[in-house]
């Protein structure tokens, strides 16, 4: 279920978007139990950002979400790797990238609901994805 929305002020070619998706998937490996093939990514390019009192020319914002909570060092490694991927593909310096990380305890998908803190006795194994 890992989801990332990457909003970029720069425009990317389709090949660059694919490369960014692949590199973000590799960054996701820092989150225990997550693999690149699990990543859902929405890559928006050509966006206009205003921050620090002015329009930003090369800026990015990342909204990352995944199921469960992980230790600080894993989150930090993930964030640094994601920002490095953006810098490599889009040329946006990590100092011009802002990122939110949401750790979700409830997630629905593939026709089911998963909750980190609740197991319905009638749900089979109740395992989250």
Spans of features found by a protein language model:
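Interaction-mediating elements
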Residues: 1-129
């Amino acid at each position: 279920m890992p989801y990332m929305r990457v909003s970029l002020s720069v425009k990317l070619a389709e090949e660059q978007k694919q490369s960014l998706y692949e590199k973000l998937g590799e960054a996701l490996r820092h989150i225990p139990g997550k693999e690149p093939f699990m990543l859902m990514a929405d890559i928006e390019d050509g966006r206009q950002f205003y921050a620090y009192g002015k329009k930003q020319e090369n800026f990015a914002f990342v909204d990352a979400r995944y199921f469960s909570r992980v230790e600080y060092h894993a989150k930090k490694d993930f964030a640094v790797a994601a920002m490095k991927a953006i810098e490599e593909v889009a040329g946006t310096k990590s100092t011009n990238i802002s990122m939110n990380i949401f750790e979700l305890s409830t997630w629905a998908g593939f026709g089911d609901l998963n909750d980190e803190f609740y197991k319905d006795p009638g749900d089979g194994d109740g395992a989250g994805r």
